Swiss-Prot record:
SMART domains given in the database record: YqgFc (SM00732)
GO MF entries: nuclease activity
Keyword Hydrolase: yes
NCBIfam families noted in UniProt: RNAse_H_YqgF
Lineage per the UniProt record: Bacteria, Bacillati, Actinomycetota, Rubrobacteria, Rubrobacterales
Enzyme class, UniProt record, top EC level: hydrolase
Database matches in Gene3D superfamilies: YqgF/RNase H-like domain
SUPFAM superfamilies tied to this protein: Ribonuclease H-like (SSF53098)
Major place of residence: cytoplasm
Species in which this protein is naturally found: Rubrobacter xylanophilus (strain DSM 9941 / JCM 11954 / NBRC 16129 / PRD-1)
Homology family: Belongs to the YqgF nuclease family.
Protein name: Putative pre-16S rRNA nuclease
An example Gene Ontology CC term for this record: cytosol
CDD domains: YqgF
Length: 139
């Protein structure tokens, strides 16, 4: 299967908030884009497909430290099934995102506690996307 055309987006799906990142047109660099309410995600994806030219979406799957699919990963998989049904023109890719949020939140621990979570979600999505791009994902 040939890779889809356009940019790649990444989602760090949460219960309430979802971090969003997007690649550049050459699929070389990831940039944090925004944090949105998870309930508003279908509208955000429509906008990304239309305005950013996104053809592929990377979705972080929060496996356990043992690499197993736990409760959170099952919840993400359920949401991913709904997104796939609503966006048949987009290729969705699951990505093991273990510890991504912890890695990016370390430098932010010194900052204010309130609001930190929102900043971390889109940074986690960007880190995940950058790893994917560097490993040749979507190429």
């Amino acid at each position: 299967m040939s890779p889809p055309e356009g940019r790649v987006a990444a989602l760090d799906l949460g219960e309430v908030w979802t971090g969003v990142a997007v690649s550049d047109p050459t699929r070389t660099l990831a940039r944090p884009l925004e944090v949105v309410r998870t309930s508003e995600l279908p509208g955000v994806l429509r906008r990304l497909v239309r305005e950013e030219g996104v053809g592929e979406v990377l979705v972080g799957l929060p496996r356990t430290l043992r690499g197993e699919v736990g409760f959170q990963a099952r919840r993400v998989s359920d949401r991913l099934s709904s997104l796939r049904a609503g966006f048949p023109e987009v290729r969705f890719v699951e990505w093991d995102e273990r510890l991504t949020t912890k890695v990016v939140s370390g430098p932010l621990r010194e900052g204010r506690r309130r609001g930190r979570r929102e900043r971390v979600d889109h940074l986690a999505a960007a880190r995940m996307l950058q790893e994917y791009l560097e490993l040749g994902g979507g190429a």
